[in-house]
């Protein structure tokens, strides 16, 4: 599964093992992939002033323990996530309701986690 920036930030905010919650919902282990462009977005956030910078640094630490998906892509992250998901056949995991709606509109399978830690598998 391909993790987006909002999901990695949510891992920090929630303080919970949301990956295990997703595995319980799916009934099988998952293999999280973090695209290099998501890491780039987190690095940009970590370098800025404000409350998000600390969360972004912590999200980068979490992401460092996962497999990086090297794409060499640049540009608008959400659109690149759509392309990656369609090319690889992996769902995108997000807590961003706007992205979730866009993914569904584009025919991309996604796993949406809301703030109450409810997991929805959507196609």
Predicted region positions:
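Charged helix-capping and loop-helix junction motifs
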Residues: 15-19
């Amino acid at each position: 599964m391909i993790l987006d920036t909002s999901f990695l930030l949510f891992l920090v905010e929630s303080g919970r093992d949301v990956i295990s919650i997703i595995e319980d919902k799916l009934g099988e282990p998952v293999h999280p992939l973090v695209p290099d462009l998501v890491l780039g977005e987190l690095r940009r956030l970590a370098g800025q002033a404000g409350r998000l910078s600390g969360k972004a640094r912590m999200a980068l630490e979490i992401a460092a323990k996962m497999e990086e998906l090297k794409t060499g892509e640049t540009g608008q992250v959400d659109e690149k996530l759509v392309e990656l998901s369609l090319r690889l056949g992996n769902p995108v995991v997000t807590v961003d309701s706007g992205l979730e709606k866009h993914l569904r509109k584009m025919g991309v399978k996604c796993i949406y986690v809301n703030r109450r830690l409810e997991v929805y598998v959507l196609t």
